[in-house]
Amino acid sequence: MSRELIILCQPILVLFLTLFYNSHGYFVSQGSVGIGFNGYFTLTNTTKHTFGQAFENEHVEIKNSSTGVISSFSVNFFFAIVPEHNQQGSHGMTFVISPTRGLPGASSDQYLGIFNKTNNGKASNNVIAIELDIHKDEEFGDIDDNHVGININGLRSVASASAGYYDDKDGSFKKLSLISREVMRLSIVYSQPDQQLNVTLFPAEIPVPPLKPLLSLNRDLSPYLLEKMYLGFTASTGSVGAIHYLMGWLVNGVIEYPRLELSIPVLPPYPKKTSNRTKTVLAVCLTVSVFAAFVASWIGFVFYLRHKKVKEVLEEWEIQYGPHRFAYKELFNATKGFKEKQLLGKGGFGQVYKGTLPGSDAEIAVKRTSHDSRQGMSEFLAEISTIGRLRHPNLVRLLGYCRHKENLYLVYDYMPNGSLDKYLNRSENQERLTWEQRFRIIKDVATALLHLHQEWVQVIIHRDIKPANVLIDNEMNARLGDFGLAKLYDQGFDPETSKVAGTFGYIAPEFLRTGRATTSTDVYAFGLVMLEVVCGRRIIERRAAENEEYLVDWILELWENGKIFDAAEESIRQEQNRGQVELVLKLGVLCSHQAASIRPAMSVVMRILNGVSQLPDNLLDVVRAEKFREWPETSMELLLLDVNTSSSLELTDSSFVSHGR
């Protein structure tokens, strides 16, 4: 995570303009970002009630994928705020660590170009910001109108202090005014071993940060950040204007306090309003310009109607859902014109193509479907509204979308090892999965479902769990994808659906009867996937001219004869694997039980897979029952043994059974 110092000043103005206005250059910007005095970078201009965002084009890998712990880092940047009125600021600016390259849906004024009224304070934001706030907002508990704050997922600071610094000579506190037009430096240092975040503000002419920080937060930041994050800056204005300058910054992957001695510029005051005479001249010029522009626009519009090839209109739902929108030309070039040799697969949903984004080595997968296909606009919106806001290592990451003519496109991270079904329905010469790989894949999918069902702010029902929708990355980790049939609802809400959707064989029996999808219907399909992974067989196979053998029935028959281990694929049937293999087979049969009330919730499934809890000894008697209500009340009180405490939980407890939520 090493960066060199970047000074945004006049000598590199030409270079910076090139990078700034190119989406593949150093910055990706939105809003009122521009170039100000002497070529310095500005986040806002004199426009009221606006915001600006500027993010580095490339992500930084801030978290270790295997340990889940973020690295130590330091950030130093130079800034200045020029207010419209000397004694009154606007709203302020921030340094942001974000899971996305930009913050879609952000608002101006008190929201500082980071959040809006709807998403402010949500744990799913995965955003950490250091605010330089020049407006006291009572709703967010601001201490004054001149302070520095540490914000996690919202605008109510977890720590804040009035602007200033501690003098190294005598330890006295020196006040600073954020709206003084003076260039200042902010140092942000996070030490992972100490789990401490230090923030230090001081005048730019001081070459090294003071020893005592202005703010300190003792907290592990790992739970709030993802593996790949983007660094950026935001600023906003309200009814009072302010120009927020960003002069330069330095990012390091190690803790250090760089000594920086720079020539500090004197910034001009806020532009004054023009006189009435000037306004009259401008009005005349503007009238002429508007007329000329109208004529030119009309000619251009006629030309466009005759020669248009790309239709990209921003609709209201696109602002709401927020993932990055790609230009069609960008995807066209990435997939080499959607050539046949780039095709990864196709089906009723459309086609999936492999591509490489121009200007980078990032490989992507592009799913193309049309409005009139089986997966049309409603499914397209379902996928954007769910996976577009999810960030989890076991879910396929949605990078963005595109609409072109009658086609819809979704852009994902490319999974080089394809889908799980390729390994289960392999050819003779294809490499077989080891038991360790299979068990890891099962746990990865279970972890993803647990996040969807119980850990996110809303409950998400996937509705199409099957091997073809489980993608394998280059480290053989499994990621759940294809949310085209997903439904989401608030925690505790009882969903009603009227349309049966999914893949034949993986649809729970109660879903076929009632059309009502629940988390338990996902558990049913997951149970079948577990069995397929262990057995290396399809859930339904033809054994004779007109006979079909069902995988669950075959495993249950072997279990009844004390031979359930024989159901496993021969290549993994080793004595040292017997315990885990039999556990997964039994758990798979339990999850795919015909009665929804018997199926466990995903939190219980994870406890069993992690060895925290055990299956009850009389589980075979349970799964033999066609309906849970056939069991006597005393027989329903089966025990789920806790390995660590030797205590037990009833099978009917909400911690075990999903209850069809």
From Swiss-Prot:
Ranges for domain Protein kinase: 338-596
> Describe its PTM?
Autophosphorylated on a Ser residue.
Active site residues according to the UniProt entry: D464
**Cell compartments where the protein resides:** Cell membrane
- Glycosylation sites per record: N45, N64, N116, N198, N276
Tell me where on the tree of life, at the top rank, the source sits: Eukaryota
Q: Might you report a single GO cellular component term?
A: plasma membrane
In terms of Pfam families, this protein maps to:
Lectin_legB, Pkinase
Its EC top class is transferase
Keywords (alphabetical) are: ATP-binding, Cell membrane, Glycoprotein, Kinase, Lectin, Membrane, Nucleotide-binding, Phosphoprotein, Plant defense, Receptor, Serine/threonine-protein kinase, Signal, Transferase, Transmembrane, Transmembrane helix
Q: Which residues take part in binding ATP?
A: L344, G345, K346, G347, G348, F349, G350, Q351, V352, K367
Q: Name one GO molecular function term.
A: ATP binding
Listed InterPro entries: ConA-like_dom_sf, Kinase-like_dom_sf, L-type_Lectin-RKs, Legume_lectin_dom, Prot_kinase_dom, Protein_kinase_ATP_BS, Ser/Thr_kinase_AS
Q: How does this protein sit in the membrane?
A: Single-pass type I membrane protein
Cytoplasmic compartment spans:
304-661
What's a BP term from Gene Ontology annotated to this protein?
protein autophosphorylation
Please write the reaction equations for the catalytic activity of this protein.
L-seryl-[protein] + ATP = O-phospho-L-seryl-[protein] + ADP + H(+); L-threonyl-[protein] + ATP = O-phospho-L-threonyl-[protein] + ADP + H(+)
Q: Does the keyword Transferase apply?
A: yes
Provide the function of this protein: Confers resistance to the pathogenic oomycetes Phytophthora infestans and Phytophthora capsici, but confers susceptibility to the pathogenic bacteria Pseudomonas syringae.
What protein does this entry describe? L-type lectin-domain containing receptor kinase V.5
Gene source species: Arabidopsis thaliana (Mouse-ear cress)
Task: Please name the taxonomic classification of the source.
Answer: Eukaryota, Viridiplantae, Streptophyta, Embryophyta, Tracheophyta
Q: Which gene encodes it?
A: LECRK55
